[in-house]
Amino acid sequence: MKIKFLGTSAGWPLPRLGCSDQICTSLDPKDKRTRSQALINERLLLDVGPDTYRHLNATDINPTTIEYAAITHEHPDHTYGLWDLGHIYNSKQIKVVIHPSTFQKIQKLFFHKEYNVLKTLTATPITAGDLKVSLLPVNHTNSSFGILVQEEDKRLFWAPDFKSFPDETTKALAGIDLIAMDASDLRITSSGHQTIEEGVKLGSQLKAKKVYFIHIGHRTLPHKELEKYVREHGGTQFEIPYDSLEVIL
């Protein structure tokens, strides 16, 4: 499974407008982050935020190969790129994998003739070429999910926004090959997001083989320091991805 991290930031890109903290003034290109999004096997998009056009206009991406897009929840940083996704020349009609409760909230964003909307209930896999895609509930909004992608015996879970997992999700993810999870804050707790400190504990609890922190906010650390932090506190299986990173699972 080929995973390309197109974007890795939280709801607002880094650097934040008008901000002069150590992340937002960093000269390290890895600290320049756009909204979290990934491309799997060049055919499946995970989330469709407002940076989608920018991501798909990269020179090493052929947008006409994209056939599917899966949505975690209704917030703008995960859905506002639908306008651009429906206007890719010479492409097949995009199939959007979405939970009915999420679709109900954002259906006015869709132009139904431009998409094939595949509404799916949790834990009901949809076949996307050589991939199986299913949604597992997470605690964020009342219609938020993580995206489980499986290719043969390899499993990826994409969960950019959550405070915690319901028990059934935790059980389903035991021993996951790679989990990409919320890193909005380092230690500052909020009602809708886990901290990186909590994520290190969760990754260890799941016995995940690889943990990549995404949805990175500016109340964390610069890339190099954050990479050092998660490895010292969690181990070598913990990673801080950056925009454009490719991983083979």
Located regions from the model:
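Conserved beta-strand hairpin/beta-sheet module of binuclear metal-dependent hydrolase folds
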Residues: 1-59, 144-160, 178
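Divalent metal-coordination and catalytic microenvironments
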Residues: 3, 47, 56, 73, ...
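Active-site metal-binding loops of divalent metal-dependent hydrolases
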Residues: 8-9, 43, 50, 74, ...
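Short, glycine/charged-enriched secondary-structure capping and boundary segments
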Residues: 18-20, 59-62, 83-87, 110-112, ...
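Active-site metal-binding motif and surrounding structural segment of the metallo-beta-lactamase
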Residues: 43, 49-98, 176-178
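Short amphipathic alpha-helix with an adjacent loop that forms part of the alpha/beta core around
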Residues: 59-60, 126-129, 168-173, 249
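Metallo-beta-lactamase
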Residues: 93-145, 151-152
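Cap/insert and terminal regions of metallo-dependent hydrolase folds
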Residues: 164-248
